[in-house]
Amino acid sequence: MELLYKNIWIVPVCPFVASMSVGLGLFFFPKATKSLRRICAIISIFLLGIAMFISFSIFWQQIRGNPNHQLLWSWFFNKDISLQIGFLIDPLTSTMLVSVTSVGILVMIYSDSYMSHDQGYVRFFAYLSLFTASMLGLVLSPNPVQIYIFWELVGMCSYLLIGFWFSRPSAANACQKAFITNRVGDFGLLLGILGTYWITGSFDIHSLSERFNDLIDSNGVNLFLANMCALLLFLGPAAKSAQFPLHVWLPDAMEGPTPISALIHAATMVAAGIFFVARMFHFFEALPFTMNIISWVGGITALLGATIALAQKDLKKGLAYSTMSQPGYMMLAPGIGSYRAASFHLITHAYSKALLFLGSGSVIHSMEPIVGYSPEKSQNMSFMGGLRKYMPITGTTFLLGTLSLCGIPPFACFWSKDEILVDSWIASASLGWIAWCTAGLTGFYMFRMYFVTFEGDFRGNLSYKDTDKSVSYKSIWGNLQTLSERDKVFSNNSYTSFSDPTGDFYEIPENVFSLPERRIKNKSLNIEKSFNVLSDFKGSDNRNEISEDAFVSINREIRNENILYPNESDNSMLFSLISLAIPTLFIGFIGVPFSHKGINSDLLSDLLAPLTDSFHKDNSENLVDFFLKSIPSVSIALVGVSISFFIYGPVSSRDLRKEIDPKTKDFLGYFFNSLSNWSYYRGYIDNLYNVIFIEGTRILSKSICFFDQWIIDGIVNGIGILSFFGGEGMRYGEGGRIPSYLFGLIIGNILMLIILIIKNDIIQSYEYFTMF
């Protein structure tokens, strides 16, 4: 055991070595490294597997009751400050190590197939290994300074991975948005760390928490200053875990590849903020005001994320807002003092959310050959439907993840979410109502996604006329294409450029050639016939003059004679889905808070015994009492599921091929349509931020530019111009001619006489009037 603890440094070093090896090889020997792309993936997976084995061993030692352990080295020391680096092993660390490594290795196995077509395959694995290493280093850090170092590395890796397809403007903008938004939180976190050290004189987490509590108890610190430092510390986790109002980066982060979306939302970046609050729990709990702020921020975030997810049509963005909502629960729990419930939900949510995201990636991977490689189509649920028939394993695992996230027993998230709901009612009726309503909304929007995606009829081979204005975008391959906005996505009049074998380019409807050439060849389509149809228009100056009949004949050949349907994903992707489905089913039982015949089943409470909270149970309740307390949370979730079933499920009489959301015209319909628009457009919060921050910054910049150009430069340039003309005037006055001097002297004397005469007349007139 001692040897295992002393070698804990191997856990973050293994993926770091993999990242550096692959990255340096790609930098110095790009061709050779790319030719060994599968070897690079195997190295990354193997080294992370070593880290996972050590993590599980440490977790087992913690379950057996072995004491916590710190491994420290002196980094910086003088008479005023002492700073150490090292590793901290405690129950929270061990659970997070297992979560990060297990989810990370399954994401890597999944990525081997998902990213196999991508030219950035090797670069992706280098980033992925560095991302995992950074999160593992953060989890093992014993002090806030070391946490901050790895915190920034996690942010940097998220920037690289969100913008992985940087040739797409949307991806480039998304990674910048995530980076800048998190800079706000990171700046607050840095100030909070410095302020905390100024108050306590220590960087060690346990020492500063104890000193801080002692100072609060003895009134040795100003409460306003203490709360200010605590809120600054909380600003970092609020941004990292996408808490309101710093949540706006999260849905745009879906521009990255789906495997990294799973890792960000399940076990790394979003989890980092919750982990930090849990790590600093004893520091925060000394300040009731700060705890109240944390709980309300979490509650508002949970409800806001759930309401925005209601009308999303992008599958990944719907899951992204679900991620925003669930960490809201996790932030609410420590805010009300329920440390155990927050840590428990962090674990159960990681596997469920990773399963859902990888399931969505499997769907997208199968939809791309049919509807095209644009995210606006391949991720749009309007094109899906009935996928369970063609992708039974993906559909089943996605359903398991959906049931878990909705809090349906006996799946993983039920046990943790129900505990948060019960504790919320105990702490505050308002927070209880918020958490309870959010649970109902979660059941609705999650099953809305499931029904629209996996039930009904497949809609990917259908197209409809669209008269709405189209919007341009750039696909991952860099081709400029067009897509219609929100509702009418099946377009016959959106065009893309196409090149025939002779090298000439034509604009053809995008939905005609949305299939990749390899899939068309597999269906034995006569591509040469299509080229011959277009060849008659080869000499036309206007490429838009291509006959509509040409498109109709090509479209009929593709759509009517060779209709394509999705296929189940590769075995490596299915292996990850099935592997994640296992903890989604069973991991919740480690925290079941009841005992039977003297046998305690709540391993999590025993594991977190040193960190008990005000809601810690004595494990004396039986199974019947526990399920009676869970009736309200399960009931509201089932209400949401039922409403979703009747609107979007197989019993729905609406034609989901035309519009997946119902439309009505009465007052109630107006209300729901307004709510739908509010949800679809993200509560207009992004628009508000654009007006306040982006447009406001532009207006301020233009105002400052105007002031600088016309006022500051005007004063400086005006003085220069006056000096110039004054000098010119004096230069002409010194011509060297005596008549000119005499003329000037006479004119000057005359002017002086005139001034004296006028002055004397004014004085005499004044004296005359004063006599009376």
Curated annotation (Swiss-Prot):
As recorded in UniProt, its EC number(s) are 7.1.1.-
GO MF annotations, alphabetized: NADH dehydrogenase (ubiquinone) activity; quinone binding
Could you tell me the membrane topology recorded for this protein? Answer: Multi-pass membrane protein
| UniProt entry keywords in alphabetical sequence | Chloroplast, Membrane, NAD, NADP, Plastid, Plastoquinone, Quinone, Thylakoid, Translocase, Transmembrane, Transmembrane helix, Transport
**Taxonomy, superkingdom:** Eukaryota
Record flagged with keyword Plastid:
yes
Q: Name one Pfam family in it.
A: Proton_antipo_N
Kindly list the biological process annotations in GO that this record carries. ATP synthesis coupled electron transport; electron transport coupled proton transport
What GO cellular component is one of the record's annotations?
chloroplast thylakoid membrane
| Residues annotated as transmembrane | 8-28, 39-59, 87-107, 120-140, 147-167, 185-205, 219-239, 258-278, 291-311, 395-415, 425-445, 574-594, 631-651, 710-730, 738-758
Please state where this protein is localized: Plastid, Chloroplast thylakoid membrane
Which ranges of the sequence are coiled-coil? none
Q: Does the keyword Transport apply?
A: yes
Q: Which reaction does it catalyse?
A: a plastoquinone + NADH + (n+1) H(+)(in) = a plastoquinol + NAD(+) + n H(+)(out); a plastoquinone + NADPH + (n+1) H(+)(in) = a plastoquinol + NADP(+) + n H(+)(out)
InterPro entries linked: NADH_UbQ_OxRdtase_chlpt_su5_C, NADHpl_OxRdtase_5_subgr, ND/Mrp_TM, NU5C-like, Proton_antipo_N
Role: NDH shuttles electrons from NAD(P)H:plastoquinone, via FMN and iron-sulfur (Fe-S) centers, to quinones in the photosynthetic chain and possibly in a chloroplast respiratory chain. The immediate electron acceptor for the enzyme in this species is believed to be plastoquinone. Couples the redox reaction to proton translocation, and thus conserves the redox energy in a proton gradient.
Q: How does it assemble?
A: NDH is composed of at least 16 different subunits, 5 of which are encoded in the nucleus.
- Family from the record: Belongs to the complex I subunit 5 family.
Name by which UniProt lists this protein: NAD(P)H-quinone oxidoreductase subunit 5, chloroplastic
Origin species = Angiopteris evecta
Tell me what gene encodes this: ndhF
